[in-house]
Amino acid sequence: MNAIIAVIADGFQEDLITCIKSIRAHTDTPIYIETSGKENKTLCEPLAEFANLTANWQKNKLGWGHSVNQLLGRINSKYVILMDPSTQFTGDAITPTIAKFAEGYKAVGWRGGLVNLADEWRSTEDKGDGEVDVLFSYFLAVDKGAALQAGGFNARAIYYRNADIEFSLRLKHAS
C-alpha cells in the first residue's frame, strides 16, 4: 500500500495528539506532520513515542497551501492522505480509500460539496456520498502524480477551505 498520511498542524496540540492516537489505533501507515511558525516549534514533541511518524517544523510561518505543496514535494509515496488534526479515525480508513484509487479515482475524501452557482461560485453546499465538485481536507486522499500534474495547491492560500476548493476544481479539470 504506497500511502502516507500527511497532517498540517497549526496549534491545537490536544487535537493533534488525539488525531494521531486514533490513526495509530487503526493503521500503521506512515504519518508526516508539517508545521511552521515559532509558536508551533514544540507542537509535535509529545508525539515522539509514535512509530513511523516524521515531523517537520519550519521557523517561518507558511500558509496551508504552501505547506501542502512542500509535503507533496517531500513525500515519496504514490498516494498522500491529507488530514486535518480535528479528524479522528474510528476504523480502518486507509484500505477502502486505496481501493477507490484502483477504480480510477484521482482523489477520494470523507466530505465534499457542490459549488454553489447561485452566488457566483463563492460557496459550496455539503453533499453526501457520490461525485462532488470539491473535496475537503478533513480527510482528502490524492494520487500524488495527479495532484502535481494539476499544479498542486495555491501557495498563497492561508486556509484549507479556500485551497481545497481551488485544488479540487483544478484536479477535476486536469483529469
Model-predicted segments: where are they?
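Donor nucleotide-sugar recognition loop
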Residues: 134-139, 148-173
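Short, acidic, metal-binding catalytic loop of nucleotide-sugar glycosyltransferases
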Residues: 21-29
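Conserved donor NDP-sugar-binding/catalytic core segment of glycosyltransferases
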Residues: 88-122
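Short beta-strand/loop segment that forms part of the nucleotide-sugar
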Residues: 28-38, 56-58
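N-proximal low-complexity "stem/linker" segments adjacent to membrane-targeting elements
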Residues: 1-22
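Glycine-rich, basic loop-to-helix element that forms the pyrophosphate-binding segment
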Residues: 58-75
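A recurrent flexible, glycine/aromatic-enriched loop bordering the glycosyltransferase active site
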Residues: 123-145
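Short aromatic/hydrophobic "clamp" motif used to bind/position activated sugar donors
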Residues: 80
